Amino acid sequence: MKSKRVRLFIKSYCPWCHKAERWLKDHAVRYQAIDVISDEAAFAEMIRLSGQELAPVIEVDGRILANFGPEQLAEFWSRLENEDAHPAAR
């Protein structure tokens, strides 16, 4: 997959957030983790992007996946890879 800007909005105590980070690391995805508990502006941005206060939220080049587990993240990532391979499919 071509290089993408990946931001993961997390809450430090959230087990689903830890699973998302583990999935990204296991798949060698470079990402920026943003703890919304310690950053009010990031929390507000997460809500603006996702429409909710629940974490995790991942943003990949403007595409949003919110309140997910590893299976949903794998499906989301697969769709992104498919779009990279077949740009007309968007």
Language-model-derived ranges and their functions:
Residues 1-27:
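Local sequence-structure signature of Cys/Sec-based thiol-disulfide redox active-site neighborhoods
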Residues 11, 51, 70:
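ATP/adenylate-binding site constellation spanning eukaryotic-like Ser/Thr protein kinases
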Residues 15, 41, 72:
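Short alpha-helical
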Residues 22, 26, 56, 75:
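Surface-exposed charge patches
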Residues 29-43, 52-53:
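Thiol-based oxidoreductase modules, predominantly thioredoxin-like and allied folds used
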Residues 50-58:
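Structural micro-motif
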Residues 60-89:
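Non-catalytic, surface beta->alpha helical segment in thiol-disulfide oxidoreductase systems
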